[in-house]
Structure formats: C-alpha cells, structure tokens
Amino acid sequence: MRYTWTDEKYRDNLRRHHIAFEDAIRIFEGPTVERVDDRFDYGEVRVYAIGLVNGLEITVIYTERDDDERRIISE
C-alpha cells in the first residue's frame, strides 16, 4: 500500500497534533477499527481508522485513491 498526502496537510497536522504522517500510518501495521465518515458529502468516501502506534491510540482519516494508494487527510 502506498500512502500520500499534501505538504499543506502534513505541516498543518504536524503543527496541531505533533505527529508526522509517516508515524501515524503505522497504525496499519496492526489491527484497526474503521468506519466511513458519512456526516457530509465530501465528494469522496472518507474513512476513519483507529489503531495503535507504540501503545498510543491514533486516528487517521483517509480516502482510497486506487487499489494501492491511500490519501491521508488528517490524523
């Protein structure tokens, strides 16, 4: 699986949450709980994934771009 993000979202997320996307995506190395965020029409399917990184609970919001790419939106 390939993970991508925009530089703007990366910097904003690092400033607000103090965790880099490279670290946050490690939740996918173990079990996750996921649900579709259907609160709004985003024009794409957004998924909340919750998992652990070094014992810390992390939530990652992503969208599937194709069969092998997840676009990280937020952590």
Question: What is the predicted function of each stretch?
Answer:
Residues 1-75:
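Ribonuclease/tRNase effector modules and their secretory precursors
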